[in-house]
């Protein structure tokens, strides 16, 4: 069953026309209105036919839970087939709807809109953090972990026990301030922390569905970075030469930074046996949905992280205390997660993504906490160098109450490090394999949050995978494991940079990408054919990615096109430049809308400036032909 729960000032409907499966109704049933109501839009699905009564009971529980949270006494039950593409039979749907109605009557003022009729309806959503919630209800046996599923069957996805636990986990939401005080997240005054307020609302509401496309979707296409691939599954993208360049630069940078702290790069398989006893247990402890396939009569799943391969490798290794902390990293191209279709959008949430996945084996919890702090700082530094500052993301720290009681000072230091309030999620019981976790979350232009960097302290998998090390006394011990993605998914880094630029544009600033990531760093524009030789000479002398706009277009159009491509430096060459040997350069980062910053400099000075801006960041050559006239159009 799919549920969409809207806390509304009012909801009213009026039937218009029956469909072939319409239930028979009395005249009084043809219209209805409730004030201050919780409206439950519902779609009964084919899975639900296996046990309609369990679906009724669980739906009633969900509705009552939300009604209690929002203090609603009026409930409208509204059949809404558009929530699912895999509906149950009309007979089962009506019986489930009536069953829910009967179970709620007596406790609430309940009204049910008729099934199988075209209806006009009007609703006014209250707009508070809990006013829009969605729920998916699945029968326990509908999608057993270990069953082969088809890639195109949304209903047959594999759902881990951890994901189910995540849906039902009781969370205590707090704001941790740098002075170490914990405050209730829903009552704490977040004035001056607008993005944190949006993040808090997003986390508490758990509404992950996308109502409109965020700005980066149009930008990724216009800048010819990436696009949807209609020939693949949803959430699988194509990357054009510019996008591939940007991805590879970030990938290389993250791997290089990880190498500096001693991480060894490895490579592991994309698919694993779902019935492998160790892996099957881990599947149920990781909150993700998996793609599954069949190979030689074996049930396989596509990895959603590098944990499986690295832990199996750790199991087979001989490890001494002298080797600890032991770090291994893999740039997973790709990791696969069967994210729900309504959550997929652009580069923000994908089903196939590139993720740097590092694991650290530590001798004990004390060492793990120390490493956690170091990697927290490393992640801040990595995002900053990519172009995402502390002011651009919000911090979430998640832990069990027991861990917090034992490590208050350490957790407070995490808030002090970023010098701003952070969101805390606390659990009474440990639902997952970790006791402590942080994420840096980017809040985009439509107030949706996405996790970037993350580190977790894992207290289960050393035992599960039988990973050991020999201590100084020759005794066999279990390590404590850290999971770390230093930057988060590479695609999300690009998403965050594009969204950040779009929000800058909304504030009246000129949008930019970091120079080291810009596919073209300098564009040379000759005014006429006679200036082409000097333009070529300038472009060839630059120690950066430089191209030449040699198209038969007006200079004005060439300059506008360079602006639409966000080229950091645009050098226009005419008669005076040829005579003086200097070029007139527009510097995008120092420009304002309709007020370009133009500076005259030599080609050598321009080259030195760009070279210094790139600094020690990775570099790759131009991904396309140097002459624009030689380039194809991808979009």
Swiss-Prot record:
Cofactor: Zn(2+)
Segments of this protein annotated with the region Editing domain: 1-144
Tagged with keyword Transcription: no
Chain residue ranges for the region called Catalytic: 215-514
Locations listed in the record: Cytoplasm
Reactions catalysed, as given in the entry: tRNA(Thr) + L-threonine + ATP = L-threonyl-tRNA(Thr) + AMP + diphosphate + H(+)
GO molecular function: ATP binding; threonine-tRNA ligase activity; tRNA binding; zinc ion binding
Enzyme Commission number: 6.1.1.3
UniProt key word Signal: no
Binding-site positions, Zn(2+): 307, 359, 483
Gene3D superfamilies: Anticodon-binding domain (3.40.50.800), Bira Bifunctional Protein, Domain 2 (3.30.930.10), D-tyrosyl-tRNA(Tyr) deacylase (3.50.80.10)
Domain of life: Archaea
Keywords of this entry: Aminoacyl-tRNA synthetase, ATP-binding, Cytoplasm, Ligase, Metal-binding, Nucleotide-binding, Protein biosynthesis, RNA-binding, tRNA-binding, Zinc
One of the record's GO cellular component terms: cytoplasm
Pfam families per record: HGTP_anticodon, tRNA-synt_2b, tRNA-Thr_ED
Cofactor note: Binds 1 zinc ion per subunit.
Description of its domains: The N-terminal domain is an archaea-specific tRNA-editing domain that hydrolyzes incorrectly charged L-seryl-tRNA(Thr). Catalysis of tRNA editing is performed by the charged tRNA itself.
Role description: Catalyzes the attachment of threonine to tRNA(Thr) in a two-step reaction: L-threonine is first activated by ATP to form Thr-AMP and then transferred to the acceptor end of tRNA(Thr). Also edits incorrectly charged L-seryl-tRNA(Thr).
UniProt similarity note: Belongs to the class-II aminoacyl-tRNA synthetase family.
Protein name from the UniProt record: Threonine--tRNA ligase
Source organism of this protein record: Methanococcoides burtonii (strain DSM 6242 / NBRC 107633 / OCM 468 / ACE-M)
């Amino acid at each position: 069953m799919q549920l969409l729960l809207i806390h509304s000032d009012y909801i009213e409907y009026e039937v218009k026309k029956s469909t072939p499966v319409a239930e028979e109704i009395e005249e009084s049933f043809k219209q209805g209105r409730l004030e201050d109501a919780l409206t439950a839009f519902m779609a009964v699905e084919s899975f639900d036919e296996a046990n309609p009564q369990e679906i009724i009971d669980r739906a009633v529980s969900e509705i009552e839970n939300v009604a209690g949270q929002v203090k609603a006494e009026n409930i409208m039950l509204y059949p809404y087939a558009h929530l699912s593409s895999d509906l149950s039979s009309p007979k089962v749907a009506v019986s489930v709807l009536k069953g829910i109605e009967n179970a709620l009557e007596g406790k609430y003022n309940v009204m049910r809109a008729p099934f199988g009729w075209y209806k006009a309806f009007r609703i006014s959503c209250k707009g508070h953090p809990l006013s829009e919630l969605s729920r998916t209800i699945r029968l326990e046996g509908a999608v057993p972990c270990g069953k082969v599923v088809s890639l195109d069957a949304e209903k047959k996805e594999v759902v881990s026990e951890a994901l189910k636990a995540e849906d039902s986990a009781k969370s205590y939401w707090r704001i941790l301030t740098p002075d170490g005080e914990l405050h209730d997240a829903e009552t704490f005054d977040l004035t001056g922390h607008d993005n944190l307020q949006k993040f808090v609302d997003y986390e508490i509401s758990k509404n992950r569905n996308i109502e409109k496309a965020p700005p980066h979707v149009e930008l990724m296409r216009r800048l010819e970075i990436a696009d949807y691939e209609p020939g693949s599954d949803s959430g699988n993208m194509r990357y054009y030469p510019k996008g591939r360049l940007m991805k590879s630069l970030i990938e290389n940078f993250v791997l290089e930074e990880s190498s500096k702290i001693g991480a060894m790069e490895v490579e592991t398989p994309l698919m694993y046996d779902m019935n492998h006893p160790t892996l099957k247990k881990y599947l149920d402890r990781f909150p993700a949905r998996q793609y599954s396939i069949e190979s030689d009569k074996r049930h396989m799943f596509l990895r959603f992280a590098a944990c499986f391969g690295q832990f199996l490798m750790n199991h087979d290794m001989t490890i001494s205390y002298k080797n600890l902390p032991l770090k291994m990293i893999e740039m997973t191209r790709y990791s696969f997660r069967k994210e729900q279709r309504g959550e997929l959008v652009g580069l923000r949430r994908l089903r196939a993504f590139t993720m740097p996945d590092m694991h650290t084996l530590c001798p004990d919890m004390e060492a793990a906490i120390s490493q956690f702090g170091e990697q927290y700082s490393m992640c801040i530094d990595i995002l900053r160098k990519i172009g995402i500052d502390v002011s651009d993301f919000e911090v979430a720290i998640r832990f069990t109450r027991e861990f917090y009681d034992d490590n208050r000072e350490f957790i407070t230091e995490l808030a002090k490090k970023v010098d701003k309030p952070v969101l805390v999620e606390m659990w009474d019981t440990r639902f997952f394999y970790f006791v402590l976790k942080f994420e840096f979350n980017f809040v985009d232009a439509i107030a949706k949050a996405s996790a970037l960097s993350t580190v977790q302290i894992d207290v289960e998998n050393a035992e599960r995978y039988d990973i050991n090390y020999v201590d100084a006394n020759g005794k066999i011990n279990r390590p404590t494991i850290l999971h770390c993605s230093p930057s988060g998914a590479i695609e999300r880094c690009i998403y965050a940079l594009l969204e950040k630029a779009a929000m800058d544009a909304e504030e009246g600033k000129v949008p930019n990408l970091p120079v080291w990531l810009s596919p073209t760093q300098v564009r040379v524009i000759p005014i006429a054919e006679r200036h082409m030789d000097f333009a070529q000479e300038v472009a060839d002398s630059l120690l950066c990615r430089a191209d030449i706009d040699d198209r038969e277009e007006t200079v004005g159009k060439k300059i506008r096109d360079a602006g639409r491509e966000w080229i950091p430096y645009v050098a226009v060459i005419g008669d005076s430049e040829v005579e003086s040997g200097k070029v007139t350069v527009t510097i995008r980062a120092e420009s304002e809308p309709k007020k370009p910053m133009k500076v005259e400099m030599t080609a050598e000075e321009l080259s030195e400036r760009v070279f210094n801006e790139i600094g020690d960041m990775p570099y790759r050559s131009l991904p396309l032909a140097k002459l624009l006239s030689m380039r194809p159009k991808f979009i």
